[in-house]
C-alpha cells in the first residue's frame, strides 16, 4: 500500500461564504451564531465526500483562522450541508502580546507544519481559495515538503468575494508563482467544488460521473 491520503481544507471562502468583509468575520463569528447566515460553496461537500469514498479512511481536517467558540455552529453547518466530519484547527480570537489581531498566515503555517511532523505517513490534498494567503502557504509548503503534498486545489473567488476577503486581482509575486510551480505538486483551480473535482485525478476523486 502507498501513503495514506489526507485532506486539509480551509473554511471561509473555500467551503462557506458569509458575504461580509474578512476583517469583520472574526467578530461576526464570535457573536452571531446562526449557521443559516452562511452559504455553502456549490460542490464542495460533494468533492470532499468523493475524496473519502475514493480513499477510505482519509481524514478531512478543516483549517481556519476563525475562533474556537464557533466550532458548534460550524459543525451544525457542515451537518446540514452534508460535509464530512473532521477535526477543526481554529485559533483564539483577540489581542496577543504583539498586536491586536492574531496572524492568520502564521496560524495556518504552524498548524500545517505540525501535521507534517505528526503524520509523516500521510500525503495531503490541500484545498483553499485565492482570496488571501492560501496559495502562498500551500505553495511554500509544497516547495519545502513536496513528498507530502499530493495536490493543491484552489477555489477562485468572484470579484465581490475578492473585495470582501480583502484580496485583489493582482497576480502573485514572482517568487510566490515560482514556489508554486517548482513545488512539483499538481495545482488546479475553479469557481466551485464541481469544477475542482473535474480537474483532480481519479486517484483522488474517483471516475468522473
Language-model regions, residue ranges each:
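Alpha-helical substrate-recognition element adjacent to the catalytic core
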Residues: 1-105, 166-168
